[in-house]
Amino acid sequence: MLIGEIMDLNLKNFLEDREEIIRDAKRKDEKSFKDFKKIVEEIKERENKDKIVCDFTEYNPLHKGHKYALEKGKEHGIFISVLPGPLERSGRGIPYFLNRYIRAEMAIRAGADIVVEGPPMGIMGSGQYMRCLIKMFYSLGAEIIPRGYIPEKTMEKVIDCINKGYHIQVKPYKIICIETGEILGEKLNIDNYVIASMSQMIYKLNREGLKFNPKFVFVKRLEGISGTKIREAIFSGKFEDIKNMLPKTTLSILKELYDNGKLNELILKRFEDRILETANEYDLYEYLPSNVAEILEKKRPFNNIEEIKNSLPYGFSRHFRERILSKLEARIPNETLSKYINNYPAKIKILAVKL
């Protein structure tokens, strides 16, 4: 397949995702929830397990650290992976390495029982997608949430707090146990911060009437695994360099794609022309925070993506600029995204099931 044809197909999929997000802002697919519950009951009976374990991971790609956490989770029940998918933009705001259907297959081969589609992380702030994530866990019936963590002094206090049934509040340079008021520390590693944010969002949504109290299972992260190194090696076909970081199932999928000459054409990329068109010609107040829209509209026209990025202010998140590019790429109005989050999940979309 020619490069132009590949980009056309990827753009077609991207635009279909966009339309689906817009539709999901104003509808509920009740049948999808019933169908999902039926499948869960069948798997519970087959596996002779009664608990539902849910985790949220990008699997970009799935490595041994992911598999280790998955195996620890499966000790407690059937395992459901929530895989962010629509628009194929990561929490960092950049395109995923491979599409969600390939990543879902990696999860199934690694041992997951079901993979469902999660929220479109790349166009959301961390609070927005955390809200969607917890609401999805609730809708899936999650009873146990396994999470990998990096050992550090403040994190040990966070774990102790959560294990007591308490919740965490995250403030700039202050991590607090909500119920006791104890200051646990000043900051956390970014991966540990996700756990604290999940706890905080559960508390917040329960205050809004959700009634969700899952048990966390904390899994110490495996050392010596780098997602960046894995992706760099895959780009160059150096699978021997990373065979100790990837489970055989992931390695098999990647090598098969590489040997068949399909890997490079499946690697996802930005639609830079679309971003430039939005930045130069559209009403940016419709899609971006007003302060960002004001800056970009004053500085346009732009000739390339770097000019846009260099014009953007620094946000609270280090991925702020890339997320703004994803917003320009997606052209989903702020009002529509807000309705989408309020209505989330509009459906349970199953990406893969273990047969």
From Swiss-Prot:
Query: Which Gene3D superfamilies does the record cross-reference, listed alphabetically?
Result: 1.20.58.620, HUPs (3.40.50.620)
The record's listing under InterPro entries reads: HIGH_NTase1_ass, Rossmann-like_a/b/a_fold, tRNA(Met)_cyd_acetate_ligase
The UniProt entry, under SUPFAM superfamilies, shows: Nucleotidylyl transferase
What Pfam family is a match for this entry?
Answer: HIGH_NTase1_ass
Cited PANTHER family: TRNA(MET) CYTIDINE ACETATE LIGASE
In which family does this protein belong, per the annotation?
Answer: Belongs to the TmcAL family.
**Name of the featured protein:** Uncharacterized protein MJ0951
